């Protein structure tokens, strides 16, 4: 039996268990008072929805999270020469993808690896070993708020659905600025996040204008939430209905 990689799942088991447990408790309470039947149905339905979403995200026919993640690499206009950084690497899927696509590149992944998600540095290294890219990849614990690298250290920088999760940064645009700080002049970047949530980033046109004011050579917004492969059910605001991507060159 071949050894399998494990890249985790965006839909946590905890939310499925939570909805299921509350739903079961409410079902029991309906025996005492019928009014509990409505919230019971809602929680049981929520449990079923998130269980389906977890299946579809990682191992369903669509392999949705793999395809969404691939958009970051597809939009990175880079030659593959030099060093690349993935901010918030999780279990390392983007690091591995970059290392496999660009055989001459060295790729670094950073993450805070908190207990909220099913990710770890050990899992990253194991996946890189299985995928045959361990010699050209490395992983370290770091915060996206203050990256432990010199200005202009990397030739390419990527990130996928991470910035909105960083609680230490009230202004998520500062995370973009910090990511660009460690990118060389002329280097390529591709960041995907919940860019359509205005309380995080404001209007997308204004966001692009702000990035242009920082002196970037090129910057473009891509509405990846409208990708045809994303099922309509997953385009709800609390799923991936607000994702977008900014790409360009410093």
Where would I find each of the regions flagged by the language model?
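Conserved SAM-binding loop of SAM-dependent methyltransferases across substrates and taxa
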Residues: 91-103
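Core SAM-dependent methyltransferase catalytic element
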Residues: 228-250
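Class I SAM-dependent methyltransferase Rossmann-like catalytic core
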Residues: 7-17, 49-72
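A short glycine-rich, Lys/Arg-flanked "PGG" loop and its adjoining helix->strand segment in the class I
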Residues: 172-185
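Conserved class I S-adenosyl-L-methionine
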Residues: 80-90, 108
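A short acidic, Gly/Pro-enriched loop at the edge of an enzyme's catalytic core
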Residues: 145-157
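Conserved SAM-binding strand-loop segment of SAM-dependent methyltransferases
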Residues: 132-144
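Conserved beta-strand signature within the Rossmann-like core of class I S-adenosyl-L-methionine
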Residues: 186-193
């Amino acid at each position: 039996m071949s050894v399998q990689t494990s890249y985790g799942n965006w839909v946590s088991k905890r939310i499925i268990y939570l909805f299921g447990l509350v739903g079961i408790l409410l079902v029991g309470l309906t025996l005492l008072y019928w009014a509990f039947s409505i919230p019971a149905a809602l929680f049981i339905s929520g449990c079923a929805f998130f269980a389906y979403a977890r299946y579809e995200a990682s191992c369903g026919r669509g392999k949705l999270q793999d395809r969404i993640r691939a958009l970051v690499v597809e939009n990175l206009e880079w030659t593959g020469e030099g060093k690349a950084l993935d901010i918030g690497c999780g279990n390392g899927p983007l690091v591995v993808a970059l290392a496999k696509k660009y055989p001459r590149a060295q790729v670094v992944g950073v993450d805070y690896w908190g207990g909220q998600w099913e990710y770890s540095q050990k899992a990253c290294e194991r996946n890189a070993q299985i995928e045959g890219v361990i010699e050209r990849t490395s992983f370290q614990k770091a915060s996206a708020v203050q990256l432990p690298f010199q200005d202009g250290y990397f030739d390419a920088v990527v990130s996928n659905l991470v910035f909105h999760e960083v609680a230490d940064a009230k202004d998520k645009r500062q995370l973009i600025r910090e990511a660009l700080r460690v990118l060389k002049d002329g280097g390529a970047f591709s960041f995907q996040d919940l860019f359509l949530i205005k309380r995080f980033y404001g209007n997308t046109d204004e966001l692009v204008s702000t990035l242009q004011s920082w002196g970037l050579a090129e910057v473009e917004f891509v509405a990846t939430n409208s990708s045809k492969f994303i099922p309509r059910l997953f385009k709800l605001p609390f799923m991936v209905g607000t994702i977008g991507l900014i790409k360009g060159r410093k």
